[in-house]
């Protein structure tokens, strides 16, 4: 892969991250599930640090993957947008939310793509969110709370919530 960062003004920057990949996956249990995938993923973002301890990231995500699965060829393309915002809560914590919307198309009418294709985004339109709250209550106690949602062809309105409390001795 390759990553380029261009600082723009004092409080913002552009970042372009391109990853090239080539996978060959075999299954010992089901040999017909052998799949070969090659392609690239591009993540182009603009980050700005605002006053009042807020960071905002806006970006364009895209990728192309070609290969074969079940003996059939596929050619998948995806393009979308993403945003990420971080609120710093004094010196004690932060709230971070990322939202990604992408549309994936495939030229050979594959109904379901392998999970390695296009960073795991499903065929069609996908909306994913990830929110995380991290907060240090005092010097010996903190908590983390994660909320994830996925709405796509595979997972209709899926919501996961995970939390933890940590004690430091």
Pin down the residues of each PLM region.
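Exposed, low-structure sequence patches enriched in small/polar residues
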Residues: 1-169
């Amino acid at each position: 892969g390759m990553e380029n960062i261009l600082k723009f003004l004092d409080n913002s920057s552009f970042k372009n991250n391109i990853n090239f990949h080539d996978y060959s996956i075999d299954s010992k249990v089901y040999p017909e599930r052998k799949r070969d995938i090659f392609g690239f993923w591009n993540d182009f973002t603009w980050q700005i640090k605002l006053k009042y301890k807020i960071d905002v990231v806006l970006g364009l995500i895209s990728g192309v993957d070609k290969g074969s699965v079940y003996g059939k060829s596929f050619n998948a393309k995806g393009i979308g947008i993403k945003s990420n915002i971080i609120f710093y809560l004094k010196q004690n914590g932060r709230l971070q939310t990322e939202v990604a919307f992408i549309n994936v198309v495939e030229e050979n009418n594959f109904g379901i793509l392998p999970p390695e294709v296009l960073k795991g985004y499903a065929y069609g339109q996908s909306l994913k969110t990830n929110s995380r709250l991290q907060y240090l209550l005092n010097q010996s106690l903190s908590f983390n709370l994660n909320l994830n949602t996925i709405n796509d062809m595979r997972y209709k309105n899926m919501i996961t919530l995970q939390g933890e409390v940590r004690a430091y001795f």
